[in-house]
Amino acid sequence: MRVRGALQAAALLASALWAAPLLAKDHPTFKTTKLDTQPNNLNYFEGSDTILFHDTHKSNLWRSDDAGATWSVVKDIPDGKVARLYMHDFDSKRAFAITDGRKHYRTTDQGKTWKTFEVDAAWDTERFDILHFHATDPDRIIFNGLHCLGFLCEEVSLYTIDDFETPAKPLRPDTLGCWWAKSSPVFTTGDSDLDKDRILCIIMGVDSIFSEDRRLVISDDFFKADKEGNIQEFEPNLAGDKPVRGVVNVAAVKRYFMVATTSANTDEMALFISTDTKKWQRAMFPNAHDDHDHKIVQEAYTVLESTNYSIQLNVMTGSKSAPMGIMFTSNYDGTYFSENLEYTNLNMFGHVDFEKIAGIQGIFLVNKVDNGKEVDEKPSTKKKLVSEITFDDGRTFDKVTADGKRIHLHSVTELNNVGRVFSSPAPGLVMANGNTGDYLGDYWEDANLYVSDDAGKTWKKALKGPHKYEFGDQGSILVAVRDSKEEDISEISYSLDHGENWVDEKLPDDLKIQPWILTTTPDSTGLQFVLIGKAKGAWHVIHIDFEGLHEATCKESDMEEWHARVDKDGEPTCIMGHTQTYPRRKKDAKCFLKKEFKLAEVETKDCDCTDQDYECDYNFERNDKGICVSRGPIPIPEGACKEGDRNGKFLGTSGYRKIPGNTCKDTKETKDKYKDVERSCGDGIGAPPDEATGELQQVDTKGKFGHWTHWEKHYLERGESSSDSSETIIMRGMNRTVDDSGPKVGPIWRTTDHGKKWDKVDFFKDDEVISIVPHPTVKDWVFFLTEGKKLIYTPDRGKRFRTFEVPQPADFEAAANGIFPLIFHPDKPNWLIWLGKKCESKNDCYRVAYGTKDGERWETLARDVYRCEFTGAEAYGRKYANRALEQILCLKHEKEGDNDSALQLVSSNDWFNQDERVRLKEAKEFATMAEFIVVATEDTEKKTLRAYASLDGSLYSEAKFPFGFEVPHQHAYTVLDSSTHAVNLFVATRMEGDKSLGTILKSNSNGTSYVVSVKNVNCDQYFYVDFEKMVGLEGVALVNVVVNPDAKSSAPKKLQTKITHNDGAQWAYLPTPRKDEFGKFPCSSSGTEKCALHIQGYTQRRDRGKTYSSEGAVGVMFGWGNVGDSLGSIKDADTFMTTDAGITWKRVKKGRWNWALGDQGSIIVLVPIRGQKTDTLEYSLDQGATWKKHTFSKEKVDIWDLTTTRSGNSQNFLIWGENSDGLFTTKIDFTKFTDHVCKYDPENLSKSDYQIFSPKHPLQPDGCLFGHVSQYLRKKPGLKCFNDFRLDPLYSKQNCTCTRSDFECDFNYELDKHGQCSLVSGLKPKDHKLWCKEHPDEIEYYEPTGFRRIPLTTCQGGLDFEKAAAVHPCPGHEDDFERKHRVSGIAIFFAVVLPVAAASAIGWWVYRHWDGKFGQIRLGEQGASTMEFFDADRPWVKYPVIALSAVVALAGAMPLVLGALWRTAKSTAERWGIGGGGGGRGGWSRLDGGGASRTFRTRDSFARGRGDYTIVDEDEGELLGEESDEEV
């Protein structure tokens, strides 16, 4: 076996002991080096006897240049500096020693000498590919590292083209790893220049840290920027003609490049393959059948040792507690996979019992689970493993036998040595530990050593017991050492005749060891071996040399021709279409080859093709007669089948394909037998859709569901990376009656075609399901809670169901109050926390948190908990160093056993195994929203609440509210949607039942410093807030404010609606619509206090699960409301909509109608609300410009709901209602309206079916919002085409230069009457020295200016109001500060001349930009018309502004504006070489001091007011099934 990877380990100090060499010529010689710590990461330089290993305890490197006989510490590297050792993948003379700093070490002479090199980045401890090497130019290396500032980290990629002789250069911002295209010697782009320079990088999504938004970009000039700053790169069309988001991994496999993508709502991944990085195709897997699936799931697929002609892949299908898989082999292009073997054995790390026989084509060994079906149904069942071998690359499999008996072999999942498990480059020689019998037994109790010298066809028992083993001199020597758990091994064994006879040899000095590894050179051509073992607390590196055994070198007469496969007469037969013949020393020859580092050369001869050279093609499978029959659609060749032509013909596969890599010569018979045959276009993959009829279709399901008062329904929405196109819904009927008479719930139904066909799920017939709980982020998974310990779940949207038991029953009383027993991890669907109710006696019960990673094994996390939550996530872990993926927060009672004791917030980053820390005491509640963790604690003396915030779950800072914002006896906070890098925190300022109201505060980027966004915001008695974000657009939201907060208690609230387009910095009234077909409005205006459009808010809606907008329809919003001076009664409301993000509105219907948006906003359907019986719906295909009616029922019915997928991507809708026969559903299908797929041409949008929509701010005509101009794609209204993929709506984003609009008032500052941020009277500015403490790597801080940068802005350059005052050094960084700010003469020239020269220009700038720049970003209640008094066209403003411009510039603006301009000039000077410078994801969460928990992660859950799931459906307003309009 050869050393390939790291060895586990501990530490090392050496004193060498030399055992006296044995005198006899027929004995090997031994030399022993004694160490006091374990050698780690032993690596040979290929083609040499030079070895390195890493002392991880003392952080040193050791080197031997004589195959391990002598060792010494590398002297060129300072003691204790080596953190990791990397060998160059493609140059056998180079290696790299990475340190914990930025100075590292490299060698180009196999470790004789080492040179330093520096990289401006730290190494990422969680990456294995820190260094990525170019396959043909060893000087070209990519360094993937980290830049960290405190606990905030970002990944960076740098490159060198001269082996770090000069400093490495950064590639581009926002990288998550980069790779050379030429990552494998056999891969090529087809262009030598591209092979040399092409780089692929995964980059962050636009304004997103989530994996589903990541992208793949390619550059051929190191991502250099042009003169305008645009990076020279392109996004490849992974999906054939369009890019794909969600790129999470890139891998080079021989001649293939593989890209894995993920998406929201699913854990299924998509694989895209290219053989040149130019043309990409999605990997296609055959249709699933029988009892297993064929989808690729995150962390559940393994790329096996592949070949130059196909990819071999193992896909996990079983539970992670008992993992099994299916092995697939691709065609030559790597795109179409066929199944080889099911129930392959693998372990929880994804290692598969699979290994090819080295050097021989088409042979590999596998272990499979013989009772796989039983294990799949019950994961606790013990696996029964059997070994099989294939000689035709997986087409067929044979048993492994020794002396006529079946044997089973320990493989990759039970590694006991390093390197390959079974074979080496020694031709045909294979060794393995195993046993005879029906199944694989225990390694220690049952295993013996077996040997094969015919590549695994026949085996013989060699030695008793399990052994570590190696091959030398191309198989002339076999060496083995008995494996043991104890330090009791005193000898080795070796064989010189292919394992027929063995000789035992004692270790020197009566040494007894516990063997650890036995290894030799990677090519197994040498006569020297290294054995490492442990004895009496020390480690021994034993060098074994067989040089003296045979002095003779083999002659031609000592050699034989060995054929990889022979017939019964000993004649060579064909494997993979050819014979394979190797020169090999005869078994009994008394000589050594002594051809170090030279492998045996194989001779091949092609054979004529036979049936054995063919296998079933993609989506074909052999039947009982051995004939390949179709199991699914057939690939259509490129260019065949015109669009819309389902009846056309094409030449497609016969159902057979030549085994990839098979080189047999075609014969006339095989050509005729396996030639392509004529197929129908309608039977192919991606077949044209049925011809469009232009008609709306519907499918009714009536009289099937019975009579119930409510529906419980769950859309299990698929992701973009899902391989199927199903639209799955799970539902059941429910009864909510006053006297609880009759059944409470009905049977569970499932549809996969959006309601066309419903099937009853019989799996639950013996179980009473209390609650149906879809996973909040991975919609493939659904959990079904029962009253006892049994929990049922499906990992694939209801195709299969499994069960497991939880440790204790749920506390359903607590669940009714919002504390739910099942808590999910956002990234890992099988990571669960269960809150169980444990009772010592009837009256002594407490809550215990249990954790599991697979549902089978549960560990106690914490006792006496109130609730727990996963706060770790892959996205946050990359950004915040302390926020581990395993991070959990719990509210736990301070005194164990005392449920009345105070709660404290505790955290753990390791499932509470070793790490448990108290973060805050007297905690009342906590909530997570986007990246923020917000905690409410109680001031026990003042009986008020305090808010704390954290980004990493470790450091919590108290929220600082603005001066004067004093609320006595605070009892409730509500964390609103905070997806724009700032917390929107609602603080209740009046808590008087239906008179309650409060203030929305907006935080800085770390959630700790707050300013007022809007006051007197309406809420209800439960502190649910009239706040609604527009989905898919940043910073757009609606609120309802109370305009009579001081009215008498008997007076009803008077509400008005306001909108913000810049994340709460400004609020304006909604403009009134124009006169329409329904009549006049009572008034008309652009939106004023006296006349505006007002929309019913969140607290007034009956069905709080409904949102105003849809993720798929950017800028489109609906609502019920009225025009006037305030919001009227909901009974008098009409239905309004906007298509431009709230700039303009129109009335689409009198009265209240329910809406649903499909096909990414191009289909809109309206139906009357419940209680208004109808037989008609209305729809629009042009964004509401025109409407058409459709009669869907012969009788008037009561429509309870209208639904479609939440993403808005579907062309199907579902009406839920009640008629005379009971409950019914009607599917409304728009797929027949067109068969034309919308065309997207990013290079020429005029030829595209899409147009650009750019949201505007009504007060900012330049189009810059949050420092950039965003452009979104929307389908052109009225076009008859459909979206066949989820369009990434964000088309482009261009940053603007920074202006006043990109800054808001800092803490303790407020807007004065001039629109400037002034210090509140009597207060001091925030001590900005705290910046130095919070950011220990910073060297300077700025005096406060009163302004701070808006967290969401991305502006660059221009004015910097935040850093416009004096700058000072941070304590301890005075020298660094001095070096940075040392000013040259030319810079002084700029400092003096520029302000004077700019003064008059600034005066003009002040005048020209008064409207849009000064006084417009404010955090208050002013509407669109509040600045009219200061309009620049007013005579009392225009001339004074011009007259006073110079004074403003030189006096008032000098400290601020010119300070910002100075920095602009300074950065420009530095660029010239002058000077010496250096869509929201969440919902709402409530923090309630009253003790009731409200854990709201999604808008659905908040809508229900019951946490993440509920026993009842989302229509929470209809508790008793009443239909009164008053119940809102």
UniProtKB/Swiss-Prot annotation:
Pfam family for this entry, one: Sortilin-Vps10
Signal peptide positions (record): 1-24
Transmembrane intervals: 1386-1406, 1441-1461
Function: Functions as a sorting receptor in the Golgi compartment required for the intracellular sorting and delivery of soluble vacuolar proteins, like carboxypeptidase Y (CPY) and proteinase A. Executes multiple rounds of sorting by cycling between the late Golgi and a prevacuolar endosome-like compartment.
Record bears the keyword Zinc: no
BNR repeats: 62-72, 105-115, 450-461, 494-502, 749-759, 1136-1146, 1179-1189
Keyword Electron transport set for record: no
Positions in the Cytoplasmic compartment: 1407-1440
GO biological process, one term: Golgi to endosome transport
The entry's keywords: Glycoprotein, Golgi apparatus, Membrane, Protein transport, Receptor, Repeat, Signal, Transmembrane, Transmembrane helix, Transport
Lumenal-side segments: 25-1385, 1462-1528
Any Gene Ontology CC annotation: cytosol
Glycosylation sites: 308, 735, 899, 1006, 1244, 1295
Gene3D superfamilies according to UniProt: 2.10.70.80, 2.120.10.10, 3.30.60.270, YVTN repeat-like/Quinoprotein amine dehydrogenase
Protein name, UniProt field: Vacuolar protein sorting/targeting protein 10
Protein topology in the membrane: Multi-pass membrane protein
